[in-house]
Amino acid sequence: MMKPKRLLSLLLRLIAVGATLAAVIIMATSHEKGTFFAVSYEAKYTDTPAFKYFVIANAIVTVYGFLVLFHPPGSPLWRLVLALDLVFTMLLISSISAALAVAQVGKNGNSRAGWLPVCGQVTKYCNQVTGALVAGLIALITYIILLLHSIYTFLNPLLEKA
Amino acid sequence: MMKPKRLLSLLLRLIAVGATLAAVIIMATSHEKGTFFAVSYEAKYTDTPAFKYFVIANAIVTVYGFLVLFHPPGSPLWRLVLALDLVFTMLLISSISAALAVAQVGKNGNSRAGWLPVCGQVTKYCNQVTGALVAGLIALITYIILLLHSIYTFLNPLLEKA
């Protein structure tokens, strides 16, 4: 039988892998043909560097999360996993912030810079980007919980002995 | 006499406070009158939510960094400082990523979305935003070094005892 703590941690890691994978798939499949000033164009995530960064970062975190699932419990490498969790949480924060900032311009535009909002023309594309960002946020929250849990279980026995 | 380690940590914290303060001042004072399609306008950081977030985040981290400077060494609260360092490093990463993503659109535009680059019209403004981002990056690197240093000095005695 698995310990409840280990089971909870495994469940959280499964959710995290699912969420980052969903973020990659939803963002990568987002495209829609729109018309802008009578010019037809196709909105794709590759048009926006911030969205490309989001896909790459989430793909990296998915691969990492998947590999950690098969990591045996009680291995001395868990200290490394704690450090890597931290690094990949920072990568997620960075990619979500960047994608969110550009998505905000896409939704509301920036009148001072003369950037018009595009979500009116490509509603489906915008909804998909929003979905990907929500999936990314779920992954981020899961990783932060995992991080707090790891720090607690890792530090607690050390603190008791100290 | 201060210990060399403590002196180094204090020096790093001074650099971090200076860098975040510089980021706030440079970004907050950035404004330039430009002409866009014969319409005169003034580019300011308040036009862009991501830049406002950058200024607020850096201001918060400046205040925190300043307060920590006066924190007595050997206090039991240093464990809290380590946790807060982590939180504020994440805040810095997030704000810099968001500002960088929008600054990239400002510099290169996004032809698919019909967003024209604005740096040709407001070069001085763009240079100041770039300066603020560089200051923010310096602060971020300093905080990451501080974090690694804190984790090392905090965990080392515990690991030896364990």
Curated annotation (Swiss-Prot), chains A, B:
Any one GO cellular component localisation term in the record: plasma membrane
Keywords: Cell membrane, Membrane, Transmembrane, Transmembrane helix
Main location: membrane
Positions on the Cytoplasmic side per record topology: 1-6, 71-79, 152-162
Cysteines paired by S-S bonds: none
Family matches, as NCBIfam families: A_tha_TIGR01569
Protein name, per record: CASP-like protein 1C2
Lineage: Eukaryota, Viridiplantae, Streptophyta, Embryophyta, Tracheophyta
